[in-house]
UniProtKB/Swiss-Prot annotation:
Keywords: ATP-binding, Cytoplasm, Kinase, Nucleotide-binding, Phosphoprotein, SH2 domain, Transferase, Tyrosine-protein kinase. Signal peptide: none annotated. This is Tyrosine-protein kinase SRK2. One of its GO terms (molecular function) is non-membrane spanning protein tyrosine kinase activity. Belongs to the protein kinase superfamily. Tyr protein kinase family. Residues 1-70 form the SH2 domain. Its EC number is 2.7.10.2. It is found in: Cytoplasm. The gene is SRK2. It catalyses: L-tyrosyl-[protein] + ATP = O-phospho-L-tyrosyl-[protein] + ADP + H(+). Residues 95-348 form the Protein kinase domain. The active site is at residue 214.
Length: 362
């Protein structure tokens, strides 16, 4: 199968991705100023359709010739009904909890049904975790954030305890559980693709001046075909528990949090970028806890002295450099999520100079 997509890093260019056995190979399709498309200049085509048809007949340097186009992996996002598009408070009686999927510090997650027909995920928040009025105000914003790489908020139940958060259901659960379980056989290209998906969702939040505050593998959900979506964005700032205090709370995720946020409560999209660098280490180590062997206090002390986690075993230096860029001391020096997205999406893209040896890649 193959897929042609517009390049994130170079508008006007395109990328061609081809599945070859267990691997996916990527090639850059360039566009000429005077019109026309090519992978290598010895074969220039008037349209993308002409290019695809040519490589369907012969590989001419590609790893294989093009066969079937890739089918869309994701169903379009929908609301529960036309009523819930603008009215997100629904009756608790309309939700049926089927089975428990997991539990976190502040609640549990269930597979459920809305009106006995629509599969949903239901996050229940422990009593006292956050003020319902504050959450409802935040939900008004969250409901409007729509992107293929963000978990879609469908509705809420804030009348009574526990508060229910109703979202789309993802078949594989949290990225952390997935990495520690069946995803252990995934290779680097798939892991980097998952990181790129997370970066794409975060780039959308960045564009809308929205901060996640708790970006980590446990807050990414995975569906079929390794589709990843960012979940729980914005909820961390609403938590009122003393255990979630940056300086002394036992439940505060110090190891994922940028120093300026952990020490001075200075959260920003750039502190999310720091957390994203930590998330990449979770990916390439299949869910290992960051800074193994260190306490939270030791992590903060060492970071202040300039310490950064070493490059994980078998991780390419170029990927480790992306992590280091995320962990720069000055938040302003860290990359944007938009830049991270295209760096990761184009991590394995081949230029024409590498094109003849494509079969040797990956």
């Amino acid at each position: 199968t193959f897929l042609v997509r517009e390049s994130e890093s170079k508008p006007g260019d395109y990328s061609l991705s081809i599945q070859d056995g267990d691997n996916v190979k990527h090639y850059r399709i360039r566009k000429l100023d005077e019109g026309g498309f090519f992978i290598t200049r010895r074969a220039v085509f008037n349209t993308l359709k002409d290019l695809v048809q040519y490589y369907q007949n012969e590989s001419d340097g590609l790893c294989v010739n093009l066969r079937q186009p890739c089918r869309p992996l994701e169903r379009p996002q929908i609301d529960l009904s036309h009523k819930t598009k603008d009215m997100w408070e629904i009756s608790r009686d309309s939700i049926t909890l089927i089975r428990k999927l997991g539990a976190g510090q502040f609640g549990e997650v269930y597979q459920g049904l809305w009106n006995n027909s629509t599969p949903v995920a239901v996050k229940t928040l422990k009593a006292g975790t956050m003020q319902p009025a504050a959450f409802l105000a935040e939900a008004q914003i969250m409901k409007k954030l729509r992107h293929p790489k963000l978990i879609q908020l469908y509705a809420v139940c804030t009348q009574g305890e526990p508060v229910y958060i109703i979202t789309e259901l993802m078949s594989k659960g949290s990225l952390l559980d997935y990495l520690q379980g069946e995803a252990g056989a995934l290779k680097l290209p798939q892991l980097i693709d998952m990181a790129a998906q997370v970066a794409a969702g975060m780039a959308y939040l960045e564009l809308h001046n929205y901060i996640h505050r708790d970006l980590a593998a446990r807050n990414i959900l995975v569906g079929d075909n390794n589709i990843c979506k960012v979940a729980d964005f914005g909820l961390a700032r609403l938590i009122v528990s003393d255990d979630y205090n940056a300086t002394e709370g036992a439940k505060f995720p110090i190891k994922w949090t940028a120093p300026e946020a952990a020490l001075f409560n200075r959260f920003s999209i750039k502190s999310d970028v720091w957390s994203f660098g930590i998330l990449i280490t979770e990916l390439v180590t299949y869910g290992r806890i960051p800074y193994p062997g260190m306490s939270n206090a030791e992590v903060l002390q060492n970071l202040d002295k300039g310490y950064r986690m070493p490059c994980p075993v078998t991780t390419p230096e170029s990927l480790y450099q992306i992590m280091l860029d995320c962990w720069k001391r000055n938040p302003a020096d860290r990359p944007t999520f938009e830049a991270l997205q295209w760096r990761l999406e184009d991590f394995f893209v081949l230029d024409a100079g590498q094109y003849q040896h494509a079969a040797d890649v990956l």
